[in-house]
Amino acid sequence: MLQKIILATVVAFVLSLASGPLFIPYLRKLKFGQKVREDGPKSHIKKSGTPTMGGIMFITATVISTLIFSHWNKYLAILLLGFLGYGLIGFADDFLKVYFKRPLGLKAREKLIGQFLLAIIISYFAQEYVGTEVIFPFLKTTIDLGNFYIPFIVFVIVGTVNSVNLTDGLDGLAAGVSFIVMAFFTMTALFLNNITYGAFSAALTGGLLGFLRYNRHPAEIFMGDTGSLAIGGAIATAAVLTKLPLILPLIGIIYVAEAFSVIIQVLSFKLFGKRVFKMSPLHHHFELSGWQEQNVVYAFWIVTLIAMFLSFYSLS
């Protein structure tokens, strides 16, 4: 199994890396460039026009590598449903922005309806395939959620998807953090001796590493919602199928911090007319506090690495 895990990682890495010189110029030719938010940090203005929808690179690499090294079964079908389903929602959002010049892409309501419907489908099949028990980290026990399972899992999936999306705001941030998170799920699958989860997680880990070659600062391409929603779907679905949704606030601590910074900022401004952060999501707050973009990214990577070791400890 270890050999297949390594090969799945390497093949996805090579495919993702090799697609860059072909895909990036093609997106430039199509003028599929990212529009930078006008109220964002001034240092980001120069990024306007950078090719987006780069998630297609590691999505394609991941799917090909997974199908080569994994066995087709109902668990893999659900993993790919979460990965490709949310990637498709992101693709529709990106395509409306860059092709039809619709600045906001899909309407928030349209996006949420799609996200919730997909989450309900995934949670239903997860309940059928793995039951309603989830592992409680640190306590080394399981909790049977019973009738609360589907509502809880829907919340976890939609929350994770949107939290990853919010994290994708600096060069290499979401890709690097998610690389570490997927490495955690790869090693977890290895301990479980499950090639289905292992091959998929390893392939996405390798695909993200290959993509980082072009997404690190200064980024040649952005993953877009195509990539960030797909990653969120993959992480959430992997956590659900391994009975580890409760590990997500720990291994995904950066995602949680980014999401809560937005929630706190909005609530604080609406209730008290004051902003807690200089700008949200959290990574922009650090930028406006004088941090270099690369230093924010490296710090968030390090925090995720620490969270990974704590996550392993919580399950040992």
Swiss-Prot record:
Disulfide partners: none
Superkingdom of this protein's organism: Bacteria
Cofactor: Mg(2+)
Pathway: Cell wall biogenesis; peptidoglycan biosynthesis
Segments crossing the lipid bilayer: 5-25, 49-69, 76-96, 116-136, 141-161, 172-192, 195-212, 221-241, 244-264, 296-316
Reaction catalyzed: UDP-N-acetyl-alpha-D-muramoyl-L-alanyl-gamma-D-glutamyl-meso-2,6-diaminopimeloyl-D-alanyl-D-alanine + di-trans,octa-cis-undecaprenyl phosphate = di-trans,octa-cis-undecaprenyl diphospho-N-acetyl-alpha-D-muramoyl-L-alanyl-D-glutamyl-meso-2,6-diaminopimeloyl-D-alanyl-D-alanine + UMP
Key word Cell cycle present: yes
EC number(s) stated in the UniProt entry for this protein: 2.7.8.13
CDD domains per UniProt: GT_MraY
Pfam family, one: MraY_sig1
Assigned protein family: Belongs to the glycosyltransferase 4 family. MraY subfamily.
Annotated HAMAP family: MraY (MF_00038)
Protein name: Phospho-N-acetylmuramoyl-pentapeptide-transferase
